[in-house]
Amino acid sequence: MSRTIQVTFDAHDPETLSRFWAAALGYVNPPPPGRELEDGQDVFEAWHDFLREVGVPESQWNSSSAAQDPDGVGPRLFFQQVPEDKAAKNRVHLDLRAAPGLQGDERMAALETECERLVGLGATRVERHE
């Protein structure tokens, strides 16, 4: 029997990372428990309202955040705030497959398009590999 997994990341700013990864993967940031979002309502505003109502101090509102596959297929991503700086190279990274099945110029064009989209979301392009 397979198991459902959650991938957990340490972060300085969980909300920003979960926003980025939700947009990058086509995921969603889940609303607070028992809440449905009104049309156009920002999920993080809903979380802030919820946390205020249950008495969580504002200093702790960005202590964790999540992004999940709206179809329930991919793993949930959980971001937890940690005070320390990163001490070493990341031991986990996510590889996005932006051009499965494509080859040659068509593949590179699809990869460039995806790279531009991710940079627009806040990613940093390090280098290009052919």
Positions of the model-derived regions?
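Intrinsically disordered, low-complexity terminal/linker regions enriched in Pro/Ser/Gly
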Residues: 126-130
